Amino acid sequence: MSSPTTAPHPAPPRLRVLVAARPALESRAVLRHVSSHLTEIELTGEPDAGPAPDAAVVCDDDVLAARLSASGVPVVFVASGGPPPGGIWPPSAVRCLHRPGWLAGQRAKGVHAVGTIAPPRAARARAARGAVVQLSTPDLDPADHAAVARAGAALRAAAEAARYDGKPLLGVVLDAPVPARSALLSAAGEDTDALPVVGVEEAATERLLAEASLLVSSPLLTAVNQAHAARVPLLLLPALDADQAGRLAGITEATGVGVLDAAAPDTSADRAVRAADPLWSRVSRALEHSGDDRRGAQRVARQVRQLLLAPF
């Protein structure tokens, strides 16, 4: 007598997590690093008309975080460049703060300070081929001619510094809205056909840094993390707004990273290259002293998994 066959159990539905970020260099970099540690989960982009996701990771987009929370989706909100403006956090199940161990700051109740959210260490090319520029102006309005002129001047000085050694620019990474990019490049006086421009949506910075001799960047915590991971010299651009001014002050006070002098870009770049080894030694010692193991991305990913197990 044959034994009855048992129907196979259907596979459990795969968990879906929405991942989204403000369209800014720092926000997208943090989201990219966190997402790389959630490979076993189905990650989706912007909300759609389909079933609600099981959870969400949102970097710096407080409007989206509040909307998802109101609709019943548990949210891990990540502040990528420091506490939100005014210290006002959006409604979310979990609040995570990206604050590297070398940066001083106060503890906030109900906030997980996760340490450094860093990119994976990448193999370096045998020889550097040139410099990389990243300029953060995510809110640039092409109709604001004064703001466009300031950003254009910053980009022009950054490009001059990047070419200090005669090597070509490997890439210029921008997060300016697409309608503002042509105005920005025009204000910088750059040949738009010759300049190797990539948008924030192309996630190019870490790939380019593998072959870079210098990173010239807006003052971003992620720029320090990226350059430190790649052991690439770093030169910061002057601040273009109040948020960048606060970040620039914190970074330079804590690490001593050099700031570009628009009147002497070549000298600024040369100084940054010569200061790179002592700079990264100081940063490494500060991370070790603070107990920061550069695993902040993994800590955020762990919060996501815990939310999936117990969302409320």
Per-segment meaning from a language model:
Residues 2, 79-148, 173-175:
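A nucleotide-sugar donor-handling region in carbohydrate enzymes
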Residues 2, 6, 268-312:
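C-terminal amphipathic helix plus adjacent low-complexity
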Residues 15-104:
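Active-site and donor-binding regions of nucleotide-sugar-utilizing enzymes
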Residues 37, 147-166:
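Short hydrophobic signal-anchor/transmembrane segments that target glycosyltransferases
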Residues 56, 214-215, 233:
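Hydrophobic acceptor-binding patch used for acceptor engagement in glycosyltransferases
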Residues 79-84, 101-102, 197-203, 238-244, ...:
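Short, acidic/turn-prone active-site loops that include or flank metal/cofactor-
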Residues 177-228:
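Donor nucleotide-activated moiety binding/catalytic core segment of transferases
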Residues 222-282:
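Catalytic binding pocket for nucleotide-activated donors in carbohydrate/polymer assembly enzymes
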